[in-house]
Every structure is written in structure tokens, then in C-alpha cells.
């Protein structure tokens, strides 16, 4: 069985880890970094870039560079948060055929699961390169507060990337696993996870290898991206005040501002002031305009104060649901890059009444925890039991549009609950059941997971048929439904077909696209490699011709020069096989030159060789050099 990897699929950055023996290890990507930007871009010629290469070109290609895609995953186009996001990103958010939020570039639509799959593919390749073997299985993390649609969409992303997702695990729970793996002490911990796009808080009890989640809460649209946006808003307002120009309509300028805002935010975690300089940010009739201003930590904190405060209410709710007070928390673990901000640490300390634990790397701890869970599933990690919870209540719509809960939030998963339903009219042969997830009292205010019809009910007066519907939530937090007609004992397994989401056919098509793209990427990489090889050979051959050209015949030299010219012409095109053939021709033509170089180097390094060859005493191809032993004392005298 191959290795199971752990992947933290983040809003801003992603990370991959694997168990090596009893220890988890974060794997560096091809660029040598331990985290990879969750950014996917398409260039003018259709090439797909993932990670750092995509981030580097974002400023010049804002409409085809997709970032923070996790905020759209599993959301409908009409979701108010999708509409809010439309005003925050330079790329186009479009309505998918299934009503979900998709993104668009050059007239082609992509689902958020598909874009996320490209990042997961990069993580998969990173692991394969390190392990030297194919990887087909993974544990992927999601925010604890993700609903069923978001979890299902994440699982779909894994499938599109060619991964069997063995488990979807909550990010704070993964962090707790990583934190508690080597610690023998038991206690109650709070994991405060403020990442690039989402916020979660989980209360866990740890002891004797058991990690039991007591409660979880959060906000799936609160994170570092919002902090960056506040700085961008401030910069555009200041620039408009000073220059009278509105930069919010300029996508190129906005992308530069976003990069500068992120950089300034990071610097202000260690410095009390930073300078933002963006020359040639725009121009008007009077000429080019430059943006230059100082941003203090105090000003930055005032810009984002309400965002930091927004994290406290979920903490309060999580404590209440867990039935503990802040003073009963033994340790507060900080997760997510945004927790490096001093103000965040200050607010957390004030709320929990204790200094937060900073012994874990907030960018890597979630991937490490995912690798630990992968190790548990693979049997490499023993004596670890993880008991997670469902973050949201699950129920159905009943008479009058009321939300009737079947499974309450913070119920330990996997879990199962049955309820008997009946008909509302005489001889009714079908019932529509609408399944919702959320905490509001009216069904319409919660998230519709999907609906299904129970058909073929035998004719009977209303209220007589007994249909037992069983809801169960698996260890991934994903909902399944089974229905059984108690009269006939006939049972139906019903897969909730979400109102949006990807169908099996959609996923299959995207898997094929991903495979085709992987093949195209492989060919593109191969082309780059053969071109590099060809150019290196031309350079080396030309250098050799200038040094040893007089040692070969004019005909041989002419053959080499024409082979160089032919390879140069081939390098201007994109035919990898043609370039390989011309490279081979040049290698063949250069053989005489190689022989001359070898003979010359042999001659230089062998005293007496020239005399031996000139005298004609040896007829062999190999020239024997004369030698004589020299007495050491004699040598010193001569010297």
C-alpha cells in the first residue's frame, strides 16, 4: 500500500505532509518552499500555472489569476457572500450550470472544485517527487464550520486531482492532533484558527491518545484576505483624497495594491511602521502618479479592529456549547498565519485569560495533523483516537416552513438518527423531504443540502404509512440518508442530490480534463527540457570549435556548423521530437571534434608523448608515454 499524505488545502497557502516512521514531515515543493500559494493562473497561450509561478505574474494578469477560491467552494452564485466576493476579486465569478458560483477566464468556466484540484495536484506531485512513488490517497483538511456542500465539493476536488480522499478532517482538530501527538499531559484545549479566508474555534479534551472535540464554531468568510482588503480600501481612499483618482476601477492597480497590503500587514507584525511605495500606480493627463505613504501598526489595528473582535463571539459560543468557562481552558493553540498579528494574540490572551501557546508553526500544523490522521488510517500511528463533531444542526422542513432538528450541532460523528414520517393526504404515493443544515428556526434561513422524493408508497389514508428515514453523518461530516417503508420493509438508500454541487458526470469530465492537462503539462515541461539541452549543446560545441576547430578537417568543421544552424532553427519551433533529432545530429557531427579534444588533452598531459608519436615507434591508437623513476634527493638538487 502506498503512502497516504495529509494536505492542508488553505485559502491563501496549501501544505503537504507525510508520516516518516513515527514522525510527521512537511514536504518542500519544487521551489524549495514548505507552503505553496493556493493560486492558479492561465497565461495568454493557455498554459496553467500553480503556486508561486502563478502568484509572481498576478499583477500583470489579474483577470486570469484565481486566488482565495476556497471562499467560493460549495457556494451558490446567489449566496450573499458570493455576491460580496464579486466586488473583492479582479477575476470574473459566473453562475455555473448547476447554480453554483464558478469562475471564468477567456470564456471558459471552471468550478471552484476544479481550480482547487489544480492546487491539490501540485501537492500530490510534491509528495510523489519526495517519496519517489505514486500517491493515490490523502486526508484533506477543511474549516470546522464548513457545511455538507462545502465538504462534498472539497472531496470532489480531491477526486478530480486523482486522489482518493480517505478522510475529510477539520482544521482545528488536525492542529490539535499535531499539538498533542508527543504530549503526555491531558487537559482541555482551545484551538483558535484564523487563516487566510476562514475562522474556526474548537474546544477539545485530550488525554491518553484520545482527542475528543467538545464543540466547534466559526465564520467561513473571515480571514487574512479581509485584513488585506481593509488596507487596500484605506490606500485607495487616501490616494483618491490626494490625487483625485479612483483606483478601484483599475484591476492592474488593485492587484499591485493587494500585494503591497499583504506585504505591509506581514511587516507590521514585527515593525511598528512600514512604508508603502508603488511608483507609476496610474497616470492622468498631467503624467504618471505614484503612491507613497507610511502605515503605522496602530493605524492598521484600527482598520481591522472589528474583524479581530468578530472572532470573539464564536469563541464565546464554543465555550458555552462545550460547557466550560475560559478559565477552565488549559492551553490556547494559535493556528493560521493571521494569528501572527500582535493585536490578535492580545485579544485572544484577554479573552481566555492566558498567554496563547506559540510552540507550533501556524502555517504547517494543520498539514502535520492531517498526516497524523493519515498515519492512523494507514495503521502507522497507534493509540490515537479522534472523536470529532458536526458543526451544524441537521434537520428537515416541516409544516409551516419550520426547521425540525434531527441531529444537533456538536454531536460526535459518525452519528445516526431515525425519524418516522407519514403522508399529509389520503392515497398519497410520494413525499418530498427537504434537508437543511444550520441553526435558524425557519428552514428557509438555513442551508438547503438537497431534497428527495420517496415514491411508490402504497395507497392508504393520510397519516397511516410509516416511512422511517435515517439520517447519518459519516466521519467526514458528510450526510447520507436511508429510507425504509415499514409496511413493506423495502429499503432505499438515497443520496442527497444537492441543489448545486457536481454530478458524477461533471466530476468524470473534470478528471479527464485534469489528466489531459497533466499530459499537456508533461509535454510542455519535456519541450523546455529538450530546448535547454539543445541550447547547452550549442553553447558547449561553439566553445569547443573556437578552441579546437583547427584540429579537425574543414569538412568536419563545416558539418558541425551546419548541424548547429539546423538545431538553432529547430529550437525556434515547438517540435520536441524534431529538436531531439537535431540535437542528436549535432552530437554525431561533433564526435570528430571530441576525438581531437581528447587527443590534445592526452598530449598535453603526457611528457614525451609527442616525441613518441612523431618518431613513429608506435603504430597503436593508444600512445605510451616514456617515464623514468627520479630519486627524491636528486629531484631536490635539480630544483
Curated annotation (Swiss-Prot):
InterPro entries referenced in this protein's UniProt entry, alphabetically: ATPase_NBD (IPR043129), Chaperone_DnaK (IPR012725), Heat_shock_70_CS (IPR018181), HSP70_C_sf (IPR029048), HSP70_peptide-bd_sf (IPR029047), Hsp_70_fam (IPR013126)
Keyword presence, Aminoacyl-tRNA synthetase: no
Induction: By stress conditions e.g. heat shock.
Domain of life the protein comes from: Bacteria
The UniProt record lists the keyword Chaperone: yes
Biased composition (Acidic residues): 623-632
GO MF term set: ATP binding; ATP-dependent protein folding chaperone; unfolded protein binding
Biased composition range(s): Low complexity: 599-615
Modification sites for Phosphothreonine: 198
Keyword annotations from UniProtKB, A to Z: ATP-binding, Chaperone, Nucleotide-binding, Phosphoprotein, Stress response
Region described as Disordered: 599-639
Family annotation (PANTHER family): HEAT SHOCK PROTEIN 70KDA (PTHR19375)
Its job: Acts as a chaperone.
Protein family: Belongs to the heat shock protein 70 family.
HAMAP family per the UniProt record, alphabetical: DnaK
Protein name: Chaperone protein DnaK
Annotated source species: Methylorubrum populi (strain ATCC BAA-705 / NCIMB 13946 / BJ001) (Methylobacterium populi)
Amino acid at each position: 500500500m502506498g503512502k497516504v499524505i495529509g494536505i492542508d488545502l488553505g485559502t491563501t497557502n496549501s501544505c503537504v505532509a507525510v508520516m516518516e516512521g513515527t514522525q510527521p514531515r512537511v514536504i518542500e515543493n519544487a521551489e524549495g518552499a514548505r507552503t505553496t500559494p493556493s493560486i492558479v493562473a492561465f497565461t495568454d497561450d493557455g498554459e496553467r500555472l500553480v503556486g508561486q509561478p502563478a502568484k509572481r505574474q498576478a499583477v500583470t494578469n489579474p483577470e486570469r489569476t484565481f486566488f482565495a477560491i476556497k471562499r467560493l467552494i460549495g457556494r451558490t452564485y446567489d449566496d450573499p457572500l458570493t455576491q460580496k466576493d464579486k466586488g473583492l476579486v479582479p477575476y470574473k465569478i459566473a453562475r455555473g450550470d448547476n447554480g453554483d458560483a464558478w469562475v471564468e477566464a477567456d470564456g471558459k468556466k471552471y468550478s471552484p472544485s476544479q481550480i482547487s484540484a489544480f492546487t491539490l495536484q501540485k501537492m500530490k506531485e510534491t509528495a510523489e517527487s519526495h517519496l519517489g512513488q505514486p500517491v493515490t490517497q490523502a486526508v484533506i483538511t477543511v474549516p470546522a464550520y464548513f457545511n455538507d456542500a462545502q465538504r462534498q465539493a472539497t472531496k470532489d476536488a480531491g477526486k478530480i486531482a486523482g486522489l482518493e480522499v480517505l478522510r475529510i478532517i477539520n482544521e482545528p482538530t488536525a492542529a490539535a492532533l499535531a499539538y498533542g501527538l508527543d504530549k503526555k499531559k491531558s487537559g482541555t484545549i482551545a484551538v483558535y484558527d484564523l487563516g487566510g479566508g476562514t475562522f474556526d474555534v474548537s474546544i477539545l479534551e485530550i488525554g491518553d491518545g484520545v482527542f475528543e472535540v467538545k464543540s466547534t464554531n466559526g465564520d467561513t468568510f473571515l480571514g487574512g484576505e479581509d485584513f488585506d482588503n481593509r488596507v487596500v480600501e484605506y490606500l485607495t481612499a487616501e490616494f483618491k483624497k490626494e490625487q483625485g483618482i479612483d483606483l478601484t476601477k483599475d484591476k492592474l492597480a488593485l492587484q499591485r495594491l493587494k500585494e503591497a497590503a499583504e506585504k505591509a500587514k506581514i511587516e507590521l507584525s514585527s515593525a511598528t511602521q512600514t512604508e508603502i511605495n508603488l511608483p507609476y500606480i496610474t497616470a492622468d493627463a498631467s503624467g504618471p502618479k505614484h503612491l507613497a505613504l507610511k502605515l503605522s501598526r496602530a493605524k492598521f489595528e484600527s482598520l481591522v479592529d472589528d474583524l479581530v473582535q468578530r472572532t470573539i463571539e464564536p469563541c464565546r459560543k464554543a465555550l458555552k456549547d462545550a460547557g466550560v468557562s475560559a478559565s477552565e481552558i488549559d492551553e490556547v493553540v494559535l493556528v493560521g498565519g493571521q494569528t501572527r498579528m500582535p493585536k490578535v494574540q492580545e485579544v485572544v490572551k484577554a479573552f481566555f485569560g492566558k498567554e496563547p501557546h506559540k510552540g507550533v508553526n501556524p502555517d504547517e500544523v494543520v498539514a502535520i495533523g492531517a498526516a497524523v490522521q493519515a498515519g492512523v488510517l494507514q495503521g502507522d500511528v497507534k493509540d490515537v483516537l479522534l472523536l470529532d463533531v458536526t458543526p451544524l444542526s441537521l434537520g428537515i422542513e416541516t409544516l409551516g416552513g419550520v426547521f425540525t432538528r434531527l441531529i444537533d450541532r456538536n454531536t460526535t460523528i459518525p452519528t445516526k438518527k431515525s425519524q418516522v414520517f407519514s403522508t399529509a393526504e389520503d392515497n398519497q404515493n410520494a413525499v418530498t423531504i427537504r434537508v437543511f443544515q444550520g441553526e435558524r428556526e425557519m428552514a428557509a434561513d438555513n442551508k438547503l443540502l438537497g431534497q428527495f422524493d420517496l415514491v411508490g408508497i402504497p395507497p392508504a389514508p393520510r397519516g397511516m404509512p410509516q416511512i422511517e428515514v435515517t439520517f447519518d453523518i459519516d466521519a467526514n461530516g458528510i450526510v447520507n440518508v436511508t429510507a425504509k417503508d415499514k409496511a413493506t420493509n423495502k429499503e432505499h438508500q438515497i443520496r442527497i442530490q444537492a441543489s448545486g454541487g457536481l454530478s458524477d458526470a461533471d466530476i468524470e469530465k473534470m478528471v479527464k480534463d485534469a489528466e489531459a492537462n497533466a499530459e499537456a503539462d508533461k509535454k510542455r515541461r519535456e519541450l523546455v527540457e529538450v530546448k535547454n539541452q539543445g541550447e547547452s549543446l550549442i553553447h558547449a560545441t561553439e566553445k569547443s570549435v573556437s578552441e579546437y576547430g583547427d584540429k579537425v578537417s574543414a569538412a568536419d568543421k563545416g558539418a558541425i556548423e551546419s548541424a548547429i544552424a539546423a538545431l538553432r532553427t529547430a529550437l525556434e519551433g515547438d517540435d520536441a521530437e524534431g529538436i531531439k533529432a537535431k540535437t542528436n545530429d549535432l552530437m554525431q557531427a561533433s564526435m570528430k571534434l571530441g576525438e581531437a579534444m581528447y587527443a590534445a588533452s592526452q598530449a598535453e598531459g603526457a611528457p614525451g608523448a609527442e616525441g613518441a608519436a612523431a618518431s613513429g615507434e608506435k603504430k597503436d591508437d593508444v600512445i605510451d608515454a616514456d617515464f623514468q623513476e627520479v630519486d627524491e634527493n636528486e629531484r631536490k638538487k635539480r630544483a
